[in-house]
Amino acid sequence: MSKNEINTNINIKDLNLWYGEKHALKDISLDIPEKSVTALIGPSGCGKSTFLRCLNRMNDLVKSCSIEGEVLVDGENIYDKDVDVVDLRKNVGMVFQKPNPFPMSIYDNIAYGPKIHGCSKSETEERVHKALDDAALMGEVQDRLGDQAFSLSGGQQQRLCIARTLAVKPEILLFDEPCSALDPISTSKIEDLILELKKDYTIVIVTHNMQQAARISDHTAFFLHGEIIEFGKTKHIFEDPQMKSTEDYITGRFG
């Protein structure tokens, strides 16, 4: 492999998606680099969150949704009929816009996934502690693991949700505007965490925050009207965009 080649483990080919009659994603083809952060940017309604949800088949939950094309994860089309969606979502974890802890203890939130996947008590405990460490939360909650998750601050709840996702040992992490409901200090902690996690995980993040995309992502895709207008290294997208619409969006002329 040449120095210019990049390993990818998510490969999208000719992806089209409809909600009823609405053509929401149009002929999307994209190769997402592994163990790096790819940001999806664009104005509201451009298709970036819809696209993100295609990567672990969350759109299956929308009755009016129909999809054509391929989404390959490690070479396997996740839309093949024989794909186990539960296993897929274990491998491709998602963290949502607002923290959504389960109504149970901090410990049980993280233990839930390993338990339902058949882990022993000792392995579950090991995974809980590692996930809390990896989510940079252990130091803040180690003496209160039995407390209700809702007793945590918003930023802590979001890191708890990240830890819960990590506990089932995914390969890929999807973030749908994970900081939009958080204060600047909590946002900074999440960003630092994402930069640390990319050493071991492929990360795709939807964000409306251009500064955030510039700070934490290695590559950026600009969406508009259900299409990818431009994709490349974040530095190039922000400093030397090739399309006028990309430049207009990044500089705040529309959005």
Curated annotation (Swiss-Prot):
Signal peptide: none annotated. It is an enzyme of class 7 (translocase). It is a peripheral membrane protein. It is found in: Cell membrane. Its main location: membrane. Pfam families: ABC_tran. SMART domains: AAA. Residues 10-250 form the ABC transporter domain. GO terms for biological process: phosphate ion transmembrane transport. Transmembrane segments: none annotated. ATP binds at residues 42-49. InterPro entries: AAA+_ATPase, ABC_transporter-like_ATP-bd, ABC_transporter-like_CS, P-loop_NTPase, PstB-like. GO terms for cellular component: plasma membrane. Keywords: ATP-binding, Cell membrane, Membrane, Nucleotide-binding, Phosphate transport, Translocase, Transport. It comes from the Archaea. It catalyses: phosphate(out) + ATP + H2O = ADP + 2 phosphate(in) + H(+). Its EC number is 7.3.2.1. PROSITE patterns: ABC_TRANSPORTER_1, ABC_TRANSPORTER_2, PSTB. GO terms for molecular function: ATP binding; ATP hydrolysis activity; ATPase-coupled phosphate ion transmembrane transporter activity. Part of the ABC transporter complex PstSACB involved in phosphate import. Responsible for energy coupling to the transport system. Belongs to the ABC transporter superfamily. Phosphate importer (TC 3.A.1.7) family. The complex is composed of two ATP-binding proteins (PstB), two transmembrane proteins (PstC and PstA) and a solute-binding protein (PstS). NCBIfam families: 3a0107s01c2. This is Phosphate import ATP-binding protein PstB. It comes from Methanococcoides burtonii (strain DSM 6242 / NBRC 107633 / OCM 468 / ACE-M). The lineage of its organism: Archaea, Methanobacteriati, Methanobacteriota, Stenosarchaea group, Methanomicrobia. The gene is pstB.
